[in-house]
């Protein structure tokens, strides 16, 4: 979100550009046209400014001219149709299978909370569900024999997500222990519970798994979306089509899933560079 200080900085930079661009000591704002604003945007890119920062500065200029137009200081807004440079989405970070196996195979003897954490991790990896979806799961939403879980995504949209044998095994073992620690006076029946026997909070999942990752896979930097990206990437690596991955992730449109196709392109590029004689 823009602050007054940021607007002031952006407009000061635009003013400096106008002085240099026109070669005048004073520039009439009514003389600024669309081409001038385009050159301003181009000058920012030439200076190495990111697409995001360039877009923000252009937004400041557009707002400034909207204000001038509203108060009749100019006859038109020369920036209104100037487009900001496209922001290239960064490739999602994901875990290598070996790192994940290292964490999941770590000893959890005499520590039910660690076993719960590893079950959560296994379910994250096996389903690609969001953190909010995971903590909202009730025991009745899990069908271990069918290897499916009912989750409620964005906007309360319900979907059935399959999970694998390892997740089913981990869930079966966890449920036996859960019944020992669950709070007896709960109104609902949460799948994952805290140390107090209540529905586990989102922040507890994040902090517990971050601690686990920091101790066993330094540098991996756990986030719930890291597991979501890992789930999608490993599926695509093993031949899943992008539309199936979209449905499993609960994306409303294919555009949200398209970023993973860039990963596939990067992979193909590396294979080419390693294998082709003229690479």
Over which residues does each language-model region extend?
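Conserved catalytic core of the tyrosine transesterase superfamily
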Residues: 1-279
């Amino acid at each position: 979100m823009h602050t007054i200080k940021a607007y002031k900085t952006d407009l000061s930079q635009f003013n400096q550009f106008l002085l240099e661009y026109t070669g005048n000591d004073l520039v009439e704002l009514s003389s600024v046209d669309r081409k001038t604003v385009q050159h301003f945007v181009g000058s920012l890119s030439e200076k190495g400014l990111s697409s995001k920062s360039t877009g923000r500065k252009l937004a400041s200029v557009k707002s400034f001219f909207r204000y001038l137009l509203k108060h009749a200081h100019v006859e038109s807004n020369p920036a209104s149709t100037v487009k900001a440079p496209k922001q290239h989405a960064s490739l999602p970070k994901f875990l290598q299978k070996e790192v994940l196996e290292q964490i999941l195979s770590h000893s959890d003897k005499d520590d039910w909370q660690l076993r719960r954490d590893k079950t959560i991790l296994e379910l994250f990896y096996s389903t690609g569900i969001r953190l909010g979806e995971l903590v909202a799961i009730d025991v009745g939403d899990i069908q271990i024999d069918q290897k499916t879980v009912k989750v409620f995504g964005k906007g309360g949209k319900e979907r059935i997500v399959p999970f694998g044998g390892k997740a089913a095994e981990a869930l079966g073992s966890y449920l036996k222990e859960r019944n020992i620690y669950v709070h007896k006076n709960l109104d609902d029946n949460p799948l994952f519970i805290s140390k107090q026997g209540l529905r586990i909070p989102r922040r507890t999942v994040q902090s517990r798994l971050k601690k686990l990752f920091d101790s066993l896979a330094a540098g991996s930097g756990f986030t719930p979306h890291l597991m979501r990206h890992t789930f999608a990437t490993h599926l695509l690596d093993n031949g899943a089509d992008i539309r199936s991955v979209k449905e499993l992730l609960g994306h409303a449109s294919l555009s949200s899933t398209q970023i993973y196709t860039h990963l596939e392109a990067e992979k193909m590029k590396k294979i080419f560079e390693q294998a082709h004689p003229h690479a």
